[in-house]
Swiss-Prot record:
The lineage of its organism: Eukaryota, Metazoa, Chordata, Craniata, Vertebrata. A motif (OAR) lies at residues 280-293. Interacts with POU1F1. This is Pituitary homeobox 1. Its main location: nucleus. Keywords: Acetylation, Activator, Developmental protein, Disease variant, DNA-binding, Homeobox, Nucleus, Phosphoprotein, Transcription, Transcription regulation. It comes from the Eukaryota. A motif (Nuclear localization signal) lies at residues 286-290. It is found in: Nucleus.
């Protein structure tokens, strides 16, 4: 009974006051192995309990945060949609009508950098938005600058050839026309005054060469023409030539020094004058050669060998 009472008393004692039961000898290792698992059980239970207790908190927290998350998700979706919309808007081109382009071009010709107020006015006139007008002016200025730059590059690249050709052309004119006419043709007109100073004896035998130079009527009247020359006039030719040269008046000299008769000047009709003078000089020389050969004056043509081709032909 006492033992029963003692057992009853131990059973009635609270669990915290009960002494631990003595471990059996054969169950020692199993007890030690199972012992560390004992404290884990309450941890797992506590973890499970904490998870159980936290789940409703998350559920409770998820309930108020749901709209925010959904709102954030909505904004996120909206944010994802907005860039797509913006990209689509950027890729979308604005097709301007001819009237709008005319108005924009006219305004661009007047002012290439319109301010905000002017752009707004243009937008009202053209039925466009102000950003679209601003973008159009920006693109138009870029196109204008590119065109100006290309024009400057073209001028710089092609500027050397016109300058070179401009420098060459005057020289070609000088050598082709100026040199061949102004010098050679002038020499064909100039042998009379040169020969009167250097070759007086030869000039005395050819008064027609001076006639080609002095075109004054008085000098022509004082000289004999080739048609009037005959065999009877040849013996008196030296004296008549010297008399004609000595009888030249100031008027004939002034006419010889006039700009029209100047050997370095350009006559009004150069080719016709040059052709006439060449024909007359050649005809006179042929006539004189025939006359000199007929009267035995062939030796008088010796001084002509010292002249150049231009003076000899004249």
């Amino acid at each position: 009974m006492d033992a029963f009472k003692g057992g009853m008393s131990l059973e009635r004692l609270p669990e915290g006051l009960r002494p631990p039961p003595p471990p059996p000898h054969d169950m020692g290792p199993a007890f030690h192995l199972a012992r560390p698992a004992d404290p884990r059980e309450p941890l797992e239970n506590s973890a499970s309990e904490s998870s159980d207790t936290e789940l409703p908190e998350k559920e409770r927290g998820g309930e108020p945060k749901g709209p925010e998350d959904s709102g954030a998700g909505g904004t996120g979706c909206g944010g994802a949609d907005d860039p797509a919309k913006k990209k689509k808007q950027r890729r979308q081109r604005t097709h301007f009508t001819s009237q709008q382009l005319q108005e924009l071009e006219a305004t661009f010709q007047r002012n290439r950098y319109p301010d905000m107020s002017m752009r707004e006015e243009i937008a009202v006139w053209t039925n466009l938005t102000e950003p679209r007008v601003r973008v159009w002016f920006k693109n138009r200025r870029a196109k204008w600058r590119k065109r100006e730059r290309n024009q400057q590059l073209d001028l710089c690249k092609g500027g050397y050839v016109p300058q070179f050709s401009g420098l060459v052309q005057p020289y070609e004119d000088v050598y082709a026309a100026g040199y061949s006419y102004n010098n050679w043709a002038a020499k064909s007109l100039a042998p009379a005054p040169l020969s009167t100073k250097s070759f007086t004896f030869f000039n005395s035998m050819s008064p027609l060469s001076s006639q080609s130079m002095f075109s004054a009527p008085s000098s022509i009247s004082s000289m004999t023409m080739p048609s009037s020359m005959g065999p009877g006039a040849v013996p008196g030719m030296p004296n008549s030539g010297l008399n004609n040269i000595n009888n030249l008046t100031g008027s004939s000299l002034n006419s010889a020094m006039s700009p029209g008769a100047c050997p370095y000047g350009t006559p009004a009709s150069p080719y016709s004058v040059y052709r006439d003078t060449c024909n007359s000089s050649l005809a006179s020389l042929r006539l004189k050669s025939k006359q000199h050969s007929s009267f035995g004056y062939g030796g008088l043509q010796g001084p002509a060998s010292g002249l150049n081709a231009c003076q000899y032909n004249s």
